[in-house]
Amino acid sequence: MSILKKTALAAATAAVFASAPALAYEAGDMMLRVGAAGVYPTSDSEEITAIAPGAKVEADDAWSLGITFSYMFTDNIGLGVLGAYPFEHDIDAKGSISSLGTVGKVKHLPPTVTLQYYFNNSTNFTPFLGAGVNYTYFFDEDTQGALSGANLDVDDSWGYAFEGGVDYNINDQWMVSGQVYYINIETEASVSAIPGKFDVDINPWVYFLSAGYKF
């Protein structure tokens, strides 16, 4: 190959790379993702002996609109915030009282902040991991069925959180994303018809599928 052809090929290659979008994240980048978030509890309450031996309650699964925001401090390290429209869970009787069915409802907001590490590479896929803290705010507690008319109160909680995810960068700005969180949510609840409080462990897996935009 002649020197002229080699030079022309090198120039063409450089032009292609110069015009290709820079898909890797950089310090100062901000990513906003919006999509569907699902909360899947993995635990239930302690035994509520004041009701009956073996009596327990459990929150069911719930989906809502989710949103995350990430800010990159460096090309690899960022800070992520998870928010959502309130999740609403049915509270189901379990154990020896499972025949009672749904005995209440509760809503919650789970704002979560994580320190994230992004594995930048030369592909359109950018995987990342994160760890941080969660605060869960419970509200609009209500009873129904066998507990109808009783007052239900669920305490807010603090806990740790882990996440893993991957962004597929369609171009330099738009992406689709999938994330999975494990969130430590351990709280206490009380019902006016039952003496004392009882522990409720929710500890959910949270699944988030979204579309995002990089600023």
Question: Over which residues does each language-model region extend?
Answer:
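Gram-negative (and chloroplast) outer-membrane scaffold detector with strong preference
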Residues: 27-29, 42, 68-144, 204-215
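Cleavable N-terminal export/targeting peptides
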Residues: 1-28
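Hydrophobic alpha-helical segments of small multi-pass membrane proteins
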Residues: 111-113, 129-135, 156-166, 180
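Predominantly the C-terminal beta-signal and adjacent terminal strand-loop region
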Residues: 88-92, 171-215
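Outer-membrane beta-barrel translocator domains and adjoining extracellular loop/strand segments
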Residues: 44-51, 90-99, 139-150, 188-196
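Domain-scale selection of a single, long terminal region
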Residues: 2-12, 61-71, 77, 85
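Short glycine/proline- and aromatic-enriched beta-strand/turn motifs that initiate or cap beta-hairpins
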Residues: 22-69, 206
